[in-house]
Amino acid sequence: NPGERPDIYGKIGNAGVSICCLDDLKKLYSGFELANSMTSVSMTINGPAPMLLAFFMNAAIDQECEKYISENGLENQVQQKIERIYKNKGVVRPKYQGELPEGNKGLGLFLLGVTGDEVLDNTIYQKIKTETLTKVRGTVQADILKEDQAQNTCIFSTEFALKMMGDVQEYFIDNGIRNFYSVSISGYHIAEAGANPISQLAFTLANGFTYVEYYLSRGMDINEFGPNLSFFFSNGVDPEYAVIGRVARRLWAKAMKNKYGANKRAQMLKYHIQTSGRSLHAQEIDFNDIRTTLQALYAIYDNCNSLHTNAYDEAITTP
């Protein structure tokens, strides 16, 4: 628990919500149906991405277990099992602190402190798990190469981080996780560190092809992992940004088709745009909305798949 570490206590929450265990993530997403087809969760996490992704998947599975328990009237039976588990452990069961927000019915909190496989028959649990993994939608950033190059939130060696990325992708393939992007290959941070549009695109595509080569070296099929790759670019007001997405898509598709023999689905480059944070000023702050609007217009005309526009006060404080 980072709250017990005096050397890092002051950093908690500086870059997002603090999640140090499965129960933390269950509390965070309580009330949201993570396996619903209308729910898609994007996690901007890199160094500890495999662990956070595991928390997320298990939280989604346990939510579906809770729904099964409720639909089959097993609440009392399961509650008794949980009480026995904690009596044997001799510790206090974790609980949600405070009142639930309006509209939150507490989905995800009934199994707080335990997991579905501890309270349900293994056959039932495995069926729920298999179905849930094919339904979850979202993205985890997990791009370790751009961390080395730009953002520097590295907690493992590059070699070990790449191995974990490969492990995650193999798990996605083996378990039929088709609606979740295992990596968001990111140029945004490279641009924020000073790269121009051309350099941003060059580094980002180079990183993408590095992942392709590495996954292929581990025996994975390009048509199975290709659809799990996504991209993330910055957008400024330089003229090259008007076509960065189209150029990226053409280069990626040609290489995936001609060099790697990928099918049409694996040739598709899906990308998210975030308007440029470093282009916004604390002094002439009234111009920030204009800058962001122009950048968003570039992105829309370039047919981005999704778009994030930065806040008016981005240059002053954490959004």
In which residue ranges do the predicted regions lie?
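Catalytic alpha/beta active-site cores
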Residues: 1-235, 240-241, 259, 266-272, ...
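Active-site-adjacent loop and "lid" segments of alpha/beta metabolic enzymes
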Residues: 198, 285-295
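Amphipathic alpha-helical scaffolding segments
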Residues: 228, 250-251
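Extended amphipathic alpha-helical segments enriched in small hydrophobics
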Residues: 242-248
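Flexible, glycine/threonine-enriched loop-and-boundary segments that flank and lead into catalytic domains
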Residues: 253, 276-287
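Surface-exposed loop-to-helix/strand elements on domain peripheries
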Residues: 270-279, 311, 317
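Active-site or pore-adjacent capping/gating segments
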Residues: 294, 305-319
